[in-house]
Amino acid sequence: MIRRSLLNFISQKRPAEPQDEMGARPLLMPFANVVHGKCSKCSKCADVCPTDAIDVSMEWTVDLGRCIFCMDCIGSCPASVIEEIPAPLYATSRDGLLFSGSKPPKESNGTIDRAKAEILGESIAIRELDTGSCNACEVEVNCMSNPYYDMSRFGMKIVASPRHADVLLVTGPMARNMREAALETFDAMPSPKVVVAMGTCAISGGIFVEGDVSGEGIKDTLEVDLYIPGCPPSPERVVLALLRAFGRN
């Protein structure tokens, strides 16, 4: 049986050596090509957006922190101005997820506070906290530890207690009943600590922003160091965002 399993493994041509580098699949985001002035600001794209991620009152603007990547805006545009382009991996500020014709998306290269990154070093313990998500982000977090993505090869691991954690990885829109638990979890972590908003709900509240939640995402409850957009962001994007934000390129 063991011999058969080994032959099956070899026949699949999987890499025998551990992978030291990780590349993320592109996450495509909607963006209006307004360079040639084709956008008439008819607001049809903004009207169909379920999370009000698009604003045409001034310059055509998309908020990647609100976007759920449904791409309904593309089909609604009568001039076919909106197209799919690769989305940035992360942002270190909320404003870093706002894009327009004068501020097009570019590859993420910012890092978290240097003092925090130097103290935490290359070993990152992560405490995942669900504040009321649909569990799509949790599925991706679970995959981060499997043999394929294997975040432990980069010195990352999920821990059960916030007292052992360096990073608080938060998902969900911060339901009111989770606010106190989130604050207690944050207070239990040793300093320095990093808070990461993973996914649209954690960043802005997403489709749940008008529900029984505390503010728009987790930023109204916790001080956020890193924003990772996506609905949900894939495992490799989360791992790669953490690596780059900690200055490990």
Feature roles, as predicted:
Residues M1, Q12-P15, Q19, I74-P162:
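Flanking helices and flexible, charged tails adjoining ferredoxin-like Fe-S electron-transfer domains
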Residues M1-P50, S108:
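Ferredoxin-type iron-sulfur electron-transfer modules and their immediate structural context
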Residues M1-R3, P229-R237, L242-N249:
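Catalytic cores of enzyme domains
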Residues L6, H36-G37, L64, I85-A87, ...:
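Fold-independent oxyanion-binding glycine-rich loops
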Residues V34, S43-A91:
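Iron-sulfur cluster-binding cysteine motifs and their immediate structural context
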Residues D47-P50, G121, N146, D187, ...:
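Generic secondary-structure signature for well-ordered alpha-helical cores
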Residues D52-T61, P190-S191, V195, V213-S214, ...:
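Ferredoxin-type iron-sulfur electron-transfer modules in oxidoreductases and energy-metabolism complexes
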Residues V139-V141, Y149, G155-V239:
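Cofactor-cradling patches in redox/metallo enzymes
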